């Protein structure tokens, strides 16, 4: 069956291109694009709160590597059979992060550890920094979901809905045909039509992004409460999407593990929103110590002020001659 069914939209013919021996993967490019978008948006939000935009990029040098490692570790922990189970892909495949497989929960958790280390170096509060970065993170997640589209992965159950996603068989360089081939090229042969769950989550993430921008502009959410709002909102969307997915996943009591994670993380985020301090941090508390020292001069001591005053009085006094004094008295 090779014809395009009316109303359905096709998956991309490939997810990787080659420049000589160098593979260019759409998934990796979109992850990089998402990181750049998160830094641009986060830098502007941080500056709007009173911080220095450059600090965002400095802390990213800590947060991004930690986040990538955390995302991969979460994926390996929750899908370990794919790599280390019977007939698993092995350690080499586990290290190939560019092939896909990042768990957002691990990325956020370990990314926060990296951000905490960066914030300590710059002497700024982590919760406030998280608030500024939250809109950028959810936007990066939306962009990253396009990588799943190119990889033909993380889709839902088969469907006859008019917006279904057509998944085609792909043939890899060795001649093996599989719809899940990351290095293959589409043969045009339709494998199945599925729910485009990547698209559902992408749309949800974009809506959350605009909602966070609106809330950040019109409400004084600080002390990590905007970041917790992002986490709670994402959990709602992710929980609903997990109900539609049908790809291989670890289950607990017949429920996908990401559904459990979404539930417990959502509860934790709501509790944090309730218990965290109200209001927002003062702008002067969001700057590095050396930046504040440059902008705000140290007050003069009493001795220095007295010295300046006496010097000013001495230099401005005008001597009066005897003739001028006599003229004034007459």
UniProtKB/Swiss-Prot annotation:
EC number: 2.5.1.145
Keywords: Cell membrane, Membrane, Transferase, Transmembrane, Transmembrane helix
UniProt-listed PROSITE patterns: LGT
Protein residues bound to a 1,2-diacyl-sn-glycero-3-phospho-(1'-sn-glycerol): 145
Gene Ontology biological process: lipoprotein biosynthetic process
Pfam families (alphabetical): LGT
Subcellular location: Cell membrane
One annotated GO molecular function: phosphatidylglycerol-prolipoprotein diacylglyceryl transferase activity
Recorded topology in the membrane: Multi-pass membrane protein
Pathway where it operates: Protein modification; lipoprotein biosynthesis (diacylglyceryl transfer)
InterPro entries the record matches: Lgt (IPR001640)
Membrane-crossing residue ranges in chain numbering: 22-42, 57-77, 97-117, 193-213, 257-277
An annotated GO cellular component: plasma membrane
Function (record text): Catalyzes the transfer of the diacylglyceryl group from phosphatidylglycerol to the sulfhydryl group of the N-terminal cysteine of a prolipoprotein, the first step in the formation of mature lipoproteins.
Family membership: Belongs to the Lgt family.
Identification of the protein by name: Phosphatidylglycerol--prolipoprotein diacylglyceryl transferase
Organism: Mycobacterium leprae (strain TN)
Lineage: Bacteria, Bacillati, Actinomycetota, Actinomycetes, Mycobacteriales
Name of the coding gene: lgt
